[in-house]
Every structure is written in structure tokens, then in C-alpha cells.
């Protein structure tokens, strides 16, 4: 018959305690390893980005369209809403055309951005001659329309806490104005912007300004660069100047505008740091590049 001595009992107890401690440590380690996955960005949408994916004419999401009738739109001239078909919630962006322009001049950008996981409205303004501050009010009205008056297919896909604006020319000026009035916006992207006001020191919204080297209507010397310089440095901001481009570069499909607009919106509307790699340090400039100049307040 086997007899267990007090010393052996102590040894067995020590082994049991060590085994329990080891098991507990393993559980803690497993939980710690799983924690990053559980704490993943809830706004992250789509696959890991690549340069070729961002340069393509469309992104990973299939897109549907909805017409916003001029007669049903309150405060702006109607437009077209582009949204991902996949059921989920997304940030929402309103885009304004420039002076004398219509939504057709920015339609390519609306559809392209939507294909990367956003709900986008490309608007018509009340008149094609509307000035920048009027366009700011209309961009704001368009955001409200998507949240309250669009179909349920659109409304149910929008995260109302993640809104942004874009615009070309005077629409870009309107974008700056609205960004100065609505600090709750997540991002602003003025495209070859025009505005008589040159100082935007009250903007705290992350802002990407895209200018054009050969713009003779809103020259970068008188518009884009002073706008960028006036935004206070604590604000996340970037300035990208298109090489050899004119004022109307945003009116036709442009891979550089598309790529960096999407990257900016992903980084700041979706808080998706996977896109920081395209903004910091940013694109190559100079010979054989589509970008004449790039500067920013990196790191973001």
C-alpha cells in the first residue's frame, strides 16, 4: 500500500499550484492576443489598400445610384447620390461643382469615392453662378438631405457622425467656408479652390487642398497656397499641387485626385490608419511625377 508523506503532499500541492498559474497565464496571453482584433477600428471598410487599388477607376465596392430631385431638395439644386450596395454604415460626403458647372462635372469623383466605401452626393447648385458662401450653405443642405430626406436605402447606410465635404473651384471655396463653420466635419477637400477670403485660421477640420500648377483662374499663388498656409498648424492638413494641370483638372477622371481624395477621406472620415502610408510622407514630386509639390503636417 502506498503512503503519502507530508513532504510529498506539499510537493504535489506545489505542482498543482504551478499548473494552475501556468493555465491562468495562458488564458491571459490568449485574451491579450485577441484584444487587438476585438478593438479593431469599427469604421474600417474594405481590403488592405494598395497603390494600384487607389489608382483604379473604381474601388472594391459595387455602387448604386439614387436621384435627388431638384424639386424635392431643400436648399440646393438636387443631385445624384452614389452609395455602396453592401449593407453597412458609411461616412457621407457632399461634393459641389464649380462656377457655371453642374453635377456632371464631378460625377466621376462621386462614383469613385463611393466605390471605396462612402455615401456621396454630387450636387447641382441652385444656379450655376452661385458664389462660394452660397455653395457652402448648399453643401450643408445636401448633407442634411441625405440624413433626413433620401430613401431608407441611403439613410440606413449613413453614419451621421462621420460627414465630409468637397468642391471644385467656387465649390472648393464653399468647402473651406463650411469647414470653418462646422468643426464637427471629419474632412474637407477643396479642389483648385477659389475664394476672395484668403485667411482660414478658424478651420480645425482635417483639410486636403489640391491645386493645379497651370491654373490661371484660381492660381495657386493667390488661392490654394495662401489657403493652406492660413490654416493653423495644429490642424491636420496637406497641400498637393498637380503637375502641369489646369483649373479644370477635377472635371475629368484623374487618378491622382482620385487616389489622394480617397486616402484622405479614409484616414479622417473612417479613421483608417492603413491609408496613412499614402499621405505620409506623401507622393513623389518632380520629374516623372504627376505631383509638382506636396506638403503636409505629417505625421497623421
UniProtKB/Swiss-Prot annotation:
Its main location: secreted. It is an enzyme of class 3 (hydrolase). Residues 1-39 form the signal peptide. Belongs to the AB hydrolase superfamily. This is Cutinase est2. Changing residue 67 to C: Increases activity on pNP-butyrate. Its cofactor is Ca(2+). Changing residue 126 to I: Increases activity on pNP-butyrate. GO terms for cellular component: extracellular region; periplasmic space. The active site is at 169 (nucleophile), 215 (charge relay system), 247 (charge relay system). Catalyzes the hydrolysis of cutin, a polyester that forms the structure of plant cuticle. Shows esterase activity towards p-nitrophenol-linked aliphatic esters (pNP-aliphatic esters). Capable of degrading the plastic poly(ethylene terephthalate) (PET), the most abundant polyester plastic in the world. Can also depolymerize the synthetic polyesters poly(epsilon-caprolactone) (PCL), poly(butylene succinate-co-adipate) (PBSA), poly(butylene succinate) (PBS), and poly(lactic acid) (PLA). It comes from Thermobifida alba (Thermomonospora alba). Changing residue 68 to V: Increases activity on pNP-butyrate. It catalyses: an acetyl ester + H2O = an aliphatic alcohol + acetate + H(+); (ethylene terephthalate)(n) + H2O = (ethylene terephthalate)(n-1) + 4-[(2-hydroxyethoxy)carbonyl]benzoate + H(+); a butanoate ester + H2O = an aliphatic alcohol + butanoate + H(+); cutin + H2O = cutin monomers. Monomer. Changing residue 99 to A: Decreases activity. Optimum temperature is 50 degrees Celsius. InterPro entries: AB_hydrolase_fold, FrsA_esterase, PET_hydrolase/cutinase-like. The keyword Zinc-finger does not apply. The keyword Signal applies.
Amino acid at each position: 500500500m502506498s503512503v503519502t508523506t507530508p513532504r510529498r503532499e506539499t510537493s504535489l500541492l506545489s505542482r498543482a499550484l504551478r499548473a494552475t498559474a501556468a493555465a491562468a497565464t495562458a488564458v491571459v496571453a490568449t485574451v491579450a492576443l485577441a484584444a487587438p482584433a476585438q478593438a479593431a477600428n469599427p469604421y474600417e471598410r474594405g481590403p488592405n489598400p494598395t497603390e494600384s487599388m487607389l489608382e483604379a477607376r473604381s474601388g472594391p465596392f459595387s455602387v448604386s445610384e439614387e436621384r435627388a430631385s431638384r424639386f424635392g431638395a431643400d436648399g440646393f439644386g438636387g443631385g445624384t447620390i452614389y452609395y455602396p450596395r453592401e449593407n453597412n454604415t458609411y461616412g457621407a460626403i457632399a461634393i459641389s461643382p464649380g462656377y457655371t458647372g453642374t453635377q456632371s462635372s464631378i460625377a466621376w469623383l462621386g462614383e469613385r469615392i463611393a466605390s471605396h466605401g462612402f455615401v456621396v452626393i454630387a450636387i447641382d447648385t441652385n444656379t450655376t453662378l452661385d458664389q462660394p458662401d452660397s455653395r457652402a450653405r448648399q453643401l450643408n443642405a445636401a448633407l442634411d438631405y441625405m440624413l433626413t430626406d433620401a430613401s431608407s436605402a441611403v439613410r440606413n447606410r449613413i453614419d451621421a457622425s462621420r460627414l465630409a465635404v468637397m468642391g471644385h473651384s467656387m465649390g472648393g471655396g464653399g468647402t473651406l467656408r463650411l469647414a470653418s463653420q462646422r468643426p464637427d466635419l471629419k474632412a474637407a477637400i477643396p479642389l483648385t479652390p477659389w475664394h476672395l477670403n484668403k485667411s482660414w485660421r478658424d478651420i480645425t477640420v482635417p483639410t486636403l487642398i489640391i491645386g493645379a500648377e497651370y491654373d490661371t483662374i484660381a492660381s495657386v499663388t493667390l488661392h490654394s497656397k495662401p489657403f493652406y498656409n492660413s490654416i493653423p498648424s495644429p490642424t491636420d492638413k496637406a497641400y498637393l499641387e498637380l503637375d502641369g494641370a489646369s483649373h479644370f483638372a477635377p472635371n475629368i477622371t484623374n487618378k491622382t485626385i482620385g487616389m489622394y481624395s480617397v486616402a484622405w477621406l479614409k484616414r479622417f472620415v473612417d479613421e483608417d490608419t492603413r491609408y496613412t502610408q499614402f499621405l505620409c510622407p506623401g507622393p513623389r514630386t518632380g520629374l516623372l511625377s504627376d505631383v509638382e509639390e506636396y506638403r503636409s503636417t505629417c505625421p497623421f
